[in-house]
């Protein structure tokens, strides 16, 4: 009986810690300077949150090939509570720049901001695909 109790307790603790973060899923990025956008899959990467470009689209909305599909776009993000995430980096393929980044999740919208030194880029919004 004691073993059954311990096994049940262990299972319940494992389920509680394995719950998915609300940020996990697929997000449609804001259009870049050329009008292209992508789908980014946000997931757990060794206890932090990362995002990989899984599809790329032309300005027309038609799926397009891209050498960046499969590459990390977001990495090292940590939840800060109240829908806020920070401590990570974001790579902007159209500018080939990496920014210190912050995210704010509100429903199915994700506000993205990032800075290089004192220059900040703010206001891009991603929308949840699934």
Residue ranges and their predicted role:
Residues 2-8:
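Sec-dependent signal peptide recognition
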Residues 7, 22, 57, 106-107:
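General secondary-structure edge motif
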Residues 11-12:
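Repetitive helical segments and hydrophobic/amphipathic motifs
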Residues 15-20:
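Sec/Tat signal peptide C-region and signal peptidase I cleavage site
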Residues 23-24, 28-100, 127:
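Central antiparallel beta-sheet cores of small beta-barrel/beta-sandwich binding domains
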Residues 94-95, 100-123:
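Short, exposed beta-strand-loop hairpins at the edges of beta-sheets
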Residues 123-129:
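Short, low-complexity, Pro/Ser/Thr/Gly-rich segments in the mature regions of secreted, periplasmic
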